[in-house]
């Protein structure tokens, strides 16, 4: 009550911030008459002047009013667009490192030019992050004219571009690209073997377009660079033949072999199902021994494959979750409706879906490097974002990214009519009403955009409209190439456009059709008469559509997030245009079926509702919103859980990447090697001759053998001890250290100091990378099963932190030991041979990187759903998948493949 009283007196925090920023708008507007009088050359000279002022110690905030006024005037001259006052406010919010919520059609792309220009003056690089390559290239081309005119360089990064071009793009003052490309380039940079192979500078300032899509929707899944593992995909194909013979039960207590947890997207075998599955697997020869049982340790791999196959058949649907194109399974993004080419689900799910669809099954992958979007974007010194829908997720932006959401008022009042939801008993009644609404709009000449949640639904609606003779366009992942054309015409009188969520971002739907597209089709040589005729025809269509009520939005289903629903509604009513929206729902929709209260369905059936009966009731609408809040909270828990786990990885990642940077930058790593050598030799001697011990406890023969096998040194310690009457453990350690130092000095004298320095650097980088790769595999394995500790009354996150630290410490010790072992056993080569080998290794590393897979991994691989489920009382563990190897399997007691002569378990097997 007190809060509401204070808000009425002083205004909300959002209103207070807008009032403060309006004072700066007044200053900018006061400068406009002076700036307008400047010639082009004088206006362009402002950029070097600002740079000089910044170099002299002035702050960005001090020059902001004048810089914004210059950018506004330059935009008017170059682009023919002048920033509105509300756009100036949006630009200030972005400069302050906050999120600007701006409605569709308010010109977010133009708003970004203000803070981009201001912050690019520092010369440290500005990254403008978009959701797809098309928007990155489009915005770089359009806004690049303005930046170039003002004397700033612009680059755009995209997959597959030449190395030199990408380095140049990152060296520009302003760089456009997608969130995925910026993330993968960061990981690639931290796999490079020389500074010349790196792309990015320091992460200085980023503006994220459609910030909710990137930092929330896509934050559930990490970016991963992976290489193929050696395990054959044959088992996926064999298990796939068995799954159709298992029967689904309606609930956990029903009859059948398995039941589905739709909230967690998991499949669980019943007790009877386990027996039936064992029987089928034995018949197929996949299980070898009936007495061991399905969950015996040696059969965990089979359980992993069976679980993946069950999920592929029971949960993941073709033309909903994925499409099959050119013999490949391509994921469809559940939030945007776009295809995610090149991305693969983890935990064997993608292979299981490939087996289900009868396309070639690709091998599973081993992680080489990974990072989440949360930790990637939190590394920028300053981060900001813009979107049409952020306020519903303001708490998450603040708690995870430290970003405040500021709602920017529209330039003109919004007049869109949002009609109440209509709820039907079943899907048939709902779609009958949708079709009737579409036909009514088409007859009246009102354009209509129909939003669907899947490709399957969009094609079903399309078929019904085709039979009814209603002309329409379909925009989904299968027709993504025609997206720009379809969206450009979606505002034509009577146009009917059926679209998945992909139509929601990036391009405005203009009433009467896109005038710019028509001008572009005319060509640059078109006469003024031709352009006038085009403009006249467009104005007539524009007025006709406004008279018919503007763009009408039809939602065929509520999304899991209210924000996605608001995005769809926001397609209508841009810049004060008329428009309307309505959602049609049924009790059979996924959201209602899975998350809404049972009493809603029972009450409607008790009231005797029939197929075509409709309910418009606030109570039902509140229940729907309550269901959406449940899903949003569940998804937030998953993202927060993922971040908690990745924060552990991130601390380790920072240490490793900082060490790599130090190695790459160093002219010489001799001091590092000398320090490591001292530690390694001390630990080695202490294993056989413990400090402060007596000679009866010493194992001199073992120490001699280890020095011979690991360091290639022949040292007779037994004879040395016999020759001295008084000698202790510390003296032995000192003598071994002296001998090893002399051994290294001999190597250096033989091959030359410069060659030795280059070799030390190369070995340290290579061993560190190999150790980190193997450590990531262990961390994956640990993470996938850690939530099971909850059943032993232990806190999974604390257990994960503790064991991750132990693994990391072990990895660092192994890296130290391996560096010294390799350098001690180095063969003497000429400088020319060493240079040639280094170049070969660099080229091989680049080739491996080119062959790597770049994934935006499914969240299942992080155990997030499982732990959230476990914390909420779930009790069905998901089998842990096995870590795959890059090399053929070596037995613990076999000779180590490195050629040391030791058993594998005493040599490189310590890392496995």
UniProtKB/Swiss-Prot annotation:
The keyword Transport applies. One of its GO terms (cellular component) is plasma membrane. Monomer and homodimer. Part of the essential Sec protein translocation apparatus which comprises SecA, SecYEG and auxiliary proteins SecDF-YajC and YidC. The lineage of its organism: Bacteria, Pseudomonadati, Pseudomonadota, Gammaproteobacteria, Lysobacterales. Belongs to the SecA family. It comes from the Bacteria. May bind 1 zinc ion per subunit. Keywords: ATP-binding, Cell inner membrane, Cell membrane, Cytoplasm, Membrane, Metal-binding, Nucleotide-binding, Protein transport, Translocase, Translocation, Transport, Zinc. Its main location: membrane. Its EC number is 7.4.2.8. GO terms for biological process: intracellular protein transmembrane transport; protein import; protein targeting; protein transport by the Sec complex. It catalyses: ATP + H2O + cellular proteinSide 1 = ADP + phosphate + cellular proteinSide 2. Pfam families: P-loop_SecA, SEC-C, SecA_DEAD, SecA_PP_bind, SecA_SW. SMART domains: SecA_DEAD, SecA_PP_bind. InterPro entries: Helicase_ATP-bd (IPR014001), Helicase_C-like (IPR001650), P-loop_NTPase (IPR027417), SEC_C_motif (IPR004027), SecA (IPR000185), SecA_CS (IPR020937), SecA_DEAD (IPR011115), SecA_motor_DEAD (IPR014018). Part of the Sec protein translocase complex. Interacts with the SecYEG preprotein conducting channel. Has a central role in coupling the hydrolysis of ATP to the transfer of proteins into and across the cell membrane, serving both as a receptor for the preprotein-SecB complex and as an ATP-driven molecular motor driving the stepwise translocation of polypeptide chains across the membrane. NCBIfam families: PRK12904.1 (NF009538), secA (TIGR00963). It is a peripheral membrane protein. Residues 869-912 are annotated as: Disordered. One of its GO terms (molecular function) is protein-exporting ATPase activity. This is Protein translocase subunit SecA.
């Amino acid at each position: 009550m007190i809060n509401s009283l204070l808000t009425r007196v002083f205004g909300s925090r959002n209103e207070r911030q807008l009032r403060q920023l309006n004072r700066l708008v007044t200053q900018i507007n006061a400068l406009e008459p002076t700036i307008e009088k400047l010639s082009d050359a004088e206006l362009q000279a402002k950029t070097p002047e600002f740079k000089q002022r910044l170099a002299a110690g002035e702050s960005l905030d001090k020059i902001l009013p004048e810089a914004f006024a210059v950018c506004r005037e330059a935009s008017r001259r170059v682009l023919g667009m002048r920033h509105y006052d509300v756009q100036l406010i949006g630009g200030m919010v972005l400069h302050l490192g906050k999120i600007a919520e701006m409605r569709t059609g308010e010109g977010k792309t133009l708003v970004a030019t203000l803070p981009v220009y201001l912050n690019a003056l520092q010369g440290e690089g500005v990254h403008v992050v978009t959701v797809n390559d098309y928007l990155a290239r489009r915005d770089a081309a359009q806004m690049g004219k303005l930046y170039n005119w003002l004397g700033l360089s612009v680059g755009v990064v995209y997959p597959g571009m030449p190395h030199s071009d990408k380095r140049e793009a990152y060296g520009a003052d302003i760089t456009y690209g997608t969130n995925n490309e910026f993330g993968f380039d960061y990981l690639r940079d931290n796999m490079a073997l020389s500074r010349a192979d790196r792309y990015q500078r320091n992460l200085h300032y980023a503006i994220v377009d459609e910030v909710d899509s990137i930092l929330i929707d896509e934050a559930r899944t990490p970016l991963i660079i992976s290489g193929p593992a050696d395990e054959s995909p044959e088992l996926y194909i064999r298990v796939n033949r068995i799954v159709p013979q298992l029967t689904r039960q309606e609930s956990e207590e029903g009859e059948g072999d398995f039941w589905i947890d739709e909230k967690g997207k998991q499949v669980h075998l019943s007790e009877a199902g386990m027996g039936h599955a064992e029987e089928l697997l034995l018949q197929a020869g996949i299980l070898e021994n009936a007495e061991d049982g399905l969950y015996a340790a040696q059969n965990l791999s089979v359980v992993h494959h069976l679980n993946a196959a069950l999920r592929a058949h029971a949960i993941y649907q073709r033309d909903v979750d994925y499409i099959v194109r050119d013999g490949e399974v391509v994921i469809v993004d559940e939030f945007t409706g776009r295809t995610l080419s090149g991305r693969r689900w983890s935990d064997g799910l993608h292979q299981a879906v490939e087996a289900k669809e009868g396309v070639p099954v690709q091998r599973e992958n081993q992680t080489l490097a990974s990072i989440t979007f949360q930790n990637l974007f939190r590394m920028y010194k300053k981060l900001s974002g813009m979107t049409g829908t952020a306020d519903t997720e303001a708490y998450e932006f603040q708690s995870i990214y430290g970003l405040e959401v500021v709602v920017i008022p529209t330039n003109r009042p919004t007049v869109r009519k949002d009609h109440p939801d209509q709820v039907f008993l079943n899907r048939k009644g709902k779609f009958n009403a949708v079709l009737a609404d579409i036909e009514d709009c088409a007859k009246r000449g009102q354009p209509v955009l129909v939003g669907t949640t899947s490709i399957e639904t969009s094609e079903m609606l399309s078929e019904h409209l085709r039979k009814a003779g209603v002309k329409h366009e379909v925009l989904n992942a299968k027709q993504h190439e025609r997206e720009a054309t379809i969206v450009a015409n979606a505002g034509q009188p009577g146009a009917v456009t059926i679209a998945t969520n992909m139509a929601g971002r990036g391009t405005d739907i203009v009433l009467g059709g896109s005038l710019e597209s028509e001008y572009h089709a005319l060509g640059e040589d078109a006469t003024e008469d031709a352009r006038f005729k085009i403009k006249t025809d467009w104005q007539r269509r524009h007025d006709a559509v406004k008279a018919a009520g503007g763009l009408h939005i039809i939602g065929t289903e509520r999304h899991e997030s209210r924000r996605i629903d608001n995005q769809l509604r926001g397609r209508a009513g841009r810049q004060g245009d008329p428009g309307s929206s309505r959602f049609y729902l049924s009790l059979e929709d996924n959201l209602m079926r899975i998350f809404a209260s049972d009493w809603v369905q029972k009450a409607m059936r008790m009231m005797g509702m029939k197929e075509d009966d409709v309910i418009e009731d606030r109570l039902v609408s509140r229940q729907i919103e309550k269901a959406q809040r449940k899903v949003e909270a569940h998804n937030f828990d998953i993202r927060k859980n993922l971040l908690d786990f990745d924060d552990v990885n991130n601390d380790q990642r920072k240490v490793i990447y900082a060490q790599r940077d130090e190695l790459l930058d160093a002219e010489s790593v001799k001091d590092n090697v000398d320090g490591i050598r001292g530690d390694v030799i001390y630990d080695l001697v202490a294993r056989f001759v413990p400090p402060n011990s007596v000679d009866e406890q010493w194992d001199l023969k073992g120490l001699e053998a280890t020095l011979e096998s690991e360091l290639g040194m022949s040292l007779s310690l037994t004879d040395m001890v016999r020759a001295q009457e008084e000698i202790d453990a510390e003296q032995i350690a000192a003598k071994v250290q002296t001998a090893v130092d002399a051994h290294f000095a001999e190597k250096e004298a033989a091959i030359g100091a410069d060659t030795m320095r280059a070799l030390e650097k190369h070995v340290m980088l290579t061993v560190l990378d190999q150790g980190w790769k193997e450590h990531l595999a262990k961390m994956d394995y640990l993470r996938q099963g850690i939530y099971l500790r909850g059943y032993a009354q232990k806190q999974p996150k604390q257990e994960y932190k503790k064991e991750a630290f132990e693994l990391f410490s072990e990895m660092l010790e192994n890296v130290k030991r391996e560096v010294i072992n390799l350098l001690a056993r180095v063969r003497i080569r000429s400088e020319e041979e060493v240079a040639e080998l280094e170049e070969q290794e660099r080229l091989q590393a680049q080739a491996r990187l080119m062959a790597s897979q770049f994934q935006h991994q499914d969240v299942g691989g992080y155990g997030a759903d499982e732990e959230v489920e476990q914390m909420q009382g779930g009790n069905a563990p998901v089998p842990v998948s096995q870590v795959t190897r890059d090399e053929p399997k070596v037995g613990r007691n076999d000779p180590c493949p490195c050629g040391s002569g030791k058993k594998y378990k005493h040599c490189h097997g310590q890392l496995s």
